[in-house]
């Protein structure tokens, strides 16, 4: 029996990598809605049904763990250690902001600037870093940056994490909580402690949107208390915890809390059940989207497979399974019975018959999953307003790569997914999350490696052996089209539109970091007009877009790679104009000065001459 169970398990999980979702009208109608729990008992009942689904299938790695944006707390909370701050005698005309997905919605990162000061948290994830003969204690440094002649450390806050800056309030977010400081006095103004895990955050319009994750408490699933702000616990009642109307695989509860960035006052909160490691958080200027992947009833999966392959088993097996599906027992019990019936069949066979059956079962399952690829794994999308009210829910086939797989534009949500690891889709959803347009089945035998949407145009990179670069015309939401395609060696993991006619791709080729400039002046005929291979095996930009900086005024961009920093011009093709040796992790610009920042020092360059005009040792 173990061998047959293994065949079924391998067929159902390893080949497909996920589970069939029955395509039935009544289920489709249920999927498109959200509701809240009325009581802890209803929550527990939902969790019990969800457990039936997940019991047979392990958590499958899908996209990058987009929600796992974790930071470790540093030293115990303490006062900043300020020094005298020189008076500001000049004001810069311009300064850079963190490279974010949606312009105007800030994202946490290790470096922030207000045009005069740099706030830098070198080690947001750990308490101590060991360098030869040195220990570095994690802190957040306050650095007078402008003008470069005043470059100096003016304070040190004994907290570290990813940073957000709103006017004169610096927020430090780590796995323990949020610590907000006045940038002028460097004194704490408010704080919050996480009772669960920190997931991600956004800053928009003076409001801080924080996403946390709380593991389920089956004994007392609600209310939940995700965080404590200024000593007061935030409590989410059952009536503010949303769930899909049908049970899906869940193991955690996500909470979005909206706070005033200056005071920490909690303005609203909402929770939503989901699955850890398989959810993506995306925020536009109109809504917050939370996604998760669902897995359908395994008994229905096997029943449908056998129904579509009637010659694989005798009639008595099919009839018993059909009758079994009407029993009022759990899905898990049904699946155990189905596997027992199939083992009975296997035991009745001769060795030759058994060998043929096992091979047929395995291969037909593979064909079955190909046929039903878009019904196998679903990405469910829940939409909440910025006032944290539920606005709808729906699903699309496949799985997301990361947050860049989602984009809202003119009231429509564009979603890029990979289906069954070897083909890809694009869906356009309206404000009610109804699918109004789609492209299916491009990049065959490949999966998505990079996505970037920009207004009416989209760019998608897929990869297995070559790097197809697809250009999408999204001007008509009901009829999106692939209008251009280019195949080149290697792949891009990050795409950035440099200007109207140019897209930069950052990726890899033959083990090295590769930069590609794509000419999109003719959307129907994209071209790789220039490429550059760095003698580095990795760049943080491949997995973290915050590490990238574009200065369009000077026609340059910065990226870290390996342990070094690189500055390229792009006006007349890719030209390396500056390479900075050693621990360069971020860059910012203030007026015409480029500051290259690393754990040990900050170097300042004049962007007109590229001469070094300042340096500050941080250790």
Curated annotation (Swiss-Prot):
Q: Name one Pfam family in it.
A: Beta_propel
* Annotated InterPro entries: Beta_propeller_containing (IPR019198), Quinoprotein_ADH-like_sf (IPR011047), UCP006425_b-propeller (IPR014441), WD40/YVTN_repeat-like_dom_sf (IPR015943)
The entry's keywords: Signal
Q: Which SUPFAM superfamilies match?
A: Quinoprotein alcohol dehydrogenase-like (SSF50998)
Signal sequence span is 1-21
Tell me yes or no: is Transport among this UniProt entry's keywords. no
Name of the featured protein: Uncharacterized protein AF_0817
């Amino acid at each position: 029996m173990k061998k047959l169970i293994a065949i079924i398990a391998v067929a159902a999980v390893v080949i497909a990598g996920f589970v069939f979702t029955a395509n039935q009208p009544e289920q489709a109608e249920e999927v498109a809605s959200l509701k809240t729990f009325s009581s802890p008992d209803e929550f527990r009942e939902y969790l019990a049904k969800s457990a039936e689904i997940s019991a047979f299938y392990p958590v499958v790695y899908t996209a990058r763990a987009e929600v796992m944006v974790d930071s470790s707390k540093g030293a115990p909370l303490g006062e900043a250690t300020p020094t005298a701050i020189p008076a500001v005698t000049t004001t810069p005309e311009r300064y850079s902001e963190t490279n974010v997905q949606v312009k105007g919605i800030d994202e946490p990162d290790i470096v922030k600037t207000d045009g005069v000061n740099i706030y830098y948290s070198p080690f947001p994830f750990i308490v101590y870093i060991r360098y030869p003969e040195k220990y570095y204690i994690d802190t957040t440094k306050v650095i007078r940056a402008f003008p470069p002649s005043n470059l100096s450390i003016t304070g040190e806050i004994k907290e570290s994490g990813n940073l957000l800056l709103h006017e004169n309030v610096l927020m430090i977010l780590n796995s323990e909580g949020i610590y907000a400081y006045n940038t002028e006095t460097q004194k704490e103004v408010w704080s919050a402690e996480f009772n669960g895990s920190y997931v991600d955050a956004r800053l928009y319009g003076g409001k801080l949107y924080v996403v946390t994750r709380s593991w389920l408490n089956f004994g007392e699933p609600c209310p939940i208390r995700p965080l404590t702000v200024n000593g007061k616990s935030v409590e989410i009642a059952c009536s503010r915890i949303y769930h899909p109307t049908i049970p899906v695989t869940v193991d955690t509860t996500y909470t979005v809390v909206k706070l005033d960035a200056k005071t920490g006052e909690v303005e609203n909160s909402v929770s939503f059940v989901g699955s850890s490691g398989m959810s993506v958080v995306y925020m536009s200027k109109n809504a917050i989207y939370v996604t998760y992947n669902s897995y359908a009833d395994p008994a229905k999966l096997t029943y449908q497979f056998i129904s579509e392959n009637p010659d694989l088993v005798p009639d008595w097996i099919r009839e018993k399974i059909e009758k079994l599906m009407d029993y009022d027992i759990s899905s898990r019990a049904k699946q155990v019975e189905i596997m027992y019936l199939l083992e009975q069949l296997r035991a009745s066979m001769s060795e030759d018959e058994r060998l043929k059956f096992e091979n047929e079962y395995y291969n037909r399952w593979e064909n079955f999953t190909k046929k039903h690829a878009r019904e196998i794994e679903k990405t469910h999308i829940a939409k909440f307003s910025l006032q944290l009210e539920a606005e709808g829910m729906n699903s699309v086939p496949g799985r997301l790569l990361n947050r860049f797989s989602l984009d809202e534009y003119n009231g429509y949500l564009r979603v890029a997914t990979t289906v069954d690891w070897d083909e890809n889709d694009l869906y356009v959803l309206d404000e009610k999350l109804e699918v109004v347009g789609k492209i299916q089945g491009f990049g065959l035998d490949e999966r998505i490696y990079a996505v970037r949407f920009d207004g009416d145009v989209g760019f998608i990179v897929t990869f297995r052996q070559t790097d197809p670069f697809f250009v999408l015309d999204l001007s008509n939401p009901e009829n999106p089209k692939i209008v251009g395609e280019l195949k080149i060696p290697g792949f891009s993991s990050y795409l950035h539109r440099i200007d109207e006619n140019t897209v930069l791709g950052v990726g890899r080729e033959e083990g090295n970091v590769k930069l590609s400039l794509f000419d999109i002046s003719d959307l129907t005929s994209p071209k790789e007009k220039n490429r550059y291979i760095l003698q580095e095996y990795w760049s943080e930009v491949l997995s973290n877009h915050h590490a990238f900086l574009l200065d369009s005024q000077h026609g340059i961009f910065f990226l870290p790679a390996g342990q070094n920093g690189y500055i390229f011009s792009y006006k007349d093709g890719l030209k390396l104009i500056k390479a900075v040796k050693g621990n360069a992790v971020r860059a910012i610009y203030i007026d015409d000065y480029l500051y290259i920042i690393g754990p040990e020092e900050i170097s300042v360059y004049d962007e007109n001459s590229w001469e070094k005009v300042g340096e500050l040792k941080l250790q």
